[in-house]
Amino acid sequence: MAYPGYGGGFGNFSIQVPGMQMGQPVPETGPAILLDGYSGPAYSDTYSSAGDSVYTYFSAVAGQDGEVDAEELQRCLTQSGINGTYSPFSLETCRIMIAMLDRDHTGKMGFNAFKELWAALNAWKENFMTVDQDGSGTVEHHELRQAIGLMGYRLSPQTLTTIVKRYSKNGRIFFDDYVACCVKLRALTDFFRKRDHLQQGSANFIYDDFLQGTMAI
């Protein structure tokens, strides 16, 4: 297997949307979209904002500017119960969630970005539950390898070991840390992908560009 590899969209697993049960596939809306030459299905927004529960959660904490900062996002996600039986997301995880989708560099998140995050979180949660076969509420090294593979990424054993050491506690990765890993993996891959003009797994960029792209996550 060649390294490195790139995942597409949120991975090859179903995305939960309001009105659908966890695990129910999203109806097909057309062929898979190739993202800048990288394989994998692209995410598409499959529901409207008007009157749905996602908007209710968001608007309950959003400021007058219609956006949320990290503390407001943390409160919103906790109140929504999206984490299920797992511990609520930490403030640091909420910060990098915002950074992942902060395309206008405001340090906040509007509703469209929140919908995108909501879909990603449900997909990552389903993926976590799929690989947590013993129901321990954590994933181990081999389960994380499976989860990352399901998302379409092809990582070297050395990189996977580095990720496990970074996000695990006594060899086990809890849901909040797992989501933080997914956020960073997606954000850094997107950052690199935009600069890999030939789509060959290599890119050149200046030091300041590198710092701007990585220090925000």
Swiss-Prot record:
Q: Which keywords appear in this protein's UniProt record, sorted alphabetically? A: Calcium, Cytoplasm, Membrane, Metal-binding, Repeat
Q: Could you say which tissues express the protein in this record?
A: Detected in neutrophils and macrophages (at protein level). Highly expressed in bone marrow.
Identify the CDD domains for this entry: EFh_PEF_grancalcin (cd16186)
Q: Name one GO molecular function term.
A: protein heterodimerization activity
Return the protein name.
Answer: Grancalcin
Q: Specify the EF-hand domain's residue ranges.
A: 48-83, 89-122, 119-154, 155-180
Q: Topologically, how does it sit relative to the membrane? A: Peripheral membrane protein
Name the source's superkingdom.
Eukaryota
The protein's location, in the record's own words, is:
Cytoplasm; Cytoplasmic granule membrane
Gene Ontology cellular component list: azurophil granule lumen; cytoplasm; cytosol; extracellular exosome; extracellular region; plasma membrane
Positions bound to Ca(2+) 1:
D65, D69, E71
Q: How does it assemble?
A: Homodimer. Interacts with SRI and LCP1.
Amino-acid positions noted as binding Ca(2+) 2 in the UniProt annotation, renumbered to this chain: D132, D134, S136, T138, E143
Q: What does this protein do?
A: Calcium-binding protein that may play a role in the adhesion of neutrophils to fibronectin. May play a role in the formation of focal adhesions.
Can you name the source organism? Answer: Homo sapiens
What additional remark is attached to this entry? This protein has been shown to bind calcium with high affinity.
GO process terms (BP):
membrane fusion
